[in-house]
Amino acid sequence: IKGEPDASSFPSGGLRATFEARGYTAWDPTSYAFIKDKTLCIPTAFCSYGGEALDKKTPLLRSMEALNKQALRILRLFGNTDVKCVRTSVGPEQEYFLVDKDMYEKRKDLMFTGRTLFGAKPPKGQELDDHYFGVIPPRVAAYMADLNEELWKLGILAKTEHNEVAPAQHELAPIYTTTNIATDHNQLTMELMKKVARRHGLVCLLHEKPFAGVNGSGKHNNWSLSTDTGVNLLEPGDTPHENAQFLVFLCAV
């Protein structure tokens, strides 16, 4: 399945000749299609007339193939001929802040930039563990439950949610999956986090540092290499031979 949309504005407008301005979309069959707002959405790669990548999915798929090729070469040196494919996997932990919508609308800096640009320090920050190890507030718990259901509808395996270190900070962790699928899922997750928050009178902030003086929001990737036979190449082995293989891949990474 291939499309031919206009690509004259990619990577930026006016840099490419008119006869080379068309682009090509190609379906990424390894990433699941999904229905959003009565529209069938098909994950695609986007390339130029000359084959240059115009998106971020194409370089990712190429890097995954390069890793697969070189990892198989190393496995063959260790005498492993059973493995046919090596895949990278990611389980991105998405951290975020939740702010009351009424309070949010009183701060123009939050509305325009997604973070605070000025203001006094709060009387209490994250010095104590009353938030991190505290009970999830009912309003936030209702948001998390609603978000989980919306994510499951799209096949996104949201698994864990909990409070984070900073006040009003929380985290969502899905079950890990193949890198390109996990990347697509994370984009959908961030979109839905903002959308669902509005239903509960909240605003979801995904900026990496929305408030000074407290922790920002990270996104731990939990990246690894796995074979099609179910072996995690970044897991230490039980024998010296298996440890040698593990150390080679660890040093390569």
Question: Which sequence ranges carry the predicted segments?
Answer:
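Glycine-rich, acidic/polar active-site loops that bind/position phosphate-bearing ligands
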Residues: 1-206, 211-253
